[in-house]
Amino acid sequence: MKRFKKVYIEITNICNLHCSFCSPVNRKKEFITLDNINHIFNEIKDYTDYIYLHVKGEPLLHPDIDKIIELADKYNLKVNLTTNGTLLKEKINLLLNKTNLNKINISLHSENDKENYLDEIFEIRDNYLKDKTVIYRLWTLNNGKFDNNSQEIVEKIINHYKLSTDIVDNIYNKNNINIDKNLYIDKDNEFEWPSLNNNVESNGYCFALKTQIAILVDGTVVPCCLDSDGKVPLGNIYKESFKDIVEGEKFNTLKKSFEDRKPSSELCRKCTFKNKFN
């Protein structure tokens, strides 16, 4: 078994939506080059089998998304794609016949003005992606309930797929629900992006650096996909080898602090997402 269950790779930090729960990007806006992504794949190929092409940004905005997936295949890397779905219809031809495209997570939002947004997503999934695992991601309030806008999305899913009463009940009572062949609903509470401005600090365990690690578009290696501004840099994969980074002092000091449930990083202490694991 390889060291990491997954590696997040940010191929762009540019997004075409401005959702209220998503923190703004305070870094230079850019797209990764094919040379740089090829370098990253070569560096990480012995450390994971699965890559997620996002930290921040909408991956389908990348003009070479098809070439990136094809490059990953040369390194036997399986690709999990997370998208807001608004560009699926426009870019679907670039995703077809990609045997290493393992899973597509579609984060369903009410915060866009695109007409027939959900209808387009349903159409693309039903006509082109039935052989792929597709997950409709829904966000709930902290009490696990849907707000009015999310409830409308749920009702459209129920009506489109003509879901049975049992499946509908599961949507409200469970977090991961199989609603059709290779099609799932995954729901989770909206979370607060970690920030040094957060007032609350806490100790606790985290899976960062044990099962996952992330690489920002500028090459900065960070503990997880929630360090969206690179506040906990462990190194830069364009300047040093991935091997040296994961065997380095910064990496191992932080990893041990997670194991001891006393994060050495201020950002990690102020991250509330780790409370899910404690």
What are these model-derived regions, one by one?
Residues 215-216:
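Short, acidic, Ser/Thr-enriched surface-loop or helix-capping motifs
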Residues 128-138, 156-201, 226-276:
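C-terminal accessory region of radical SAM enzymes
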Residues 209-211:
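Short loop/turn microsegments at loop-to-beta-strand junctions
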Residues 1-104, 112-119, 278:
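Conserved alpha-helical substructure of the radical SAM core
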Residues 106, 111, 125-159:
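Conserved strand-turn element in the central/C-terminal portion of the radical SAM core barrel
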Residues 15, 19-22, 206, 224-225, ...:
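Short cysteine clusters
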Residues 45-46, 92-114, 151-179:
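Structural recognition of alpha->loop->beta junctions
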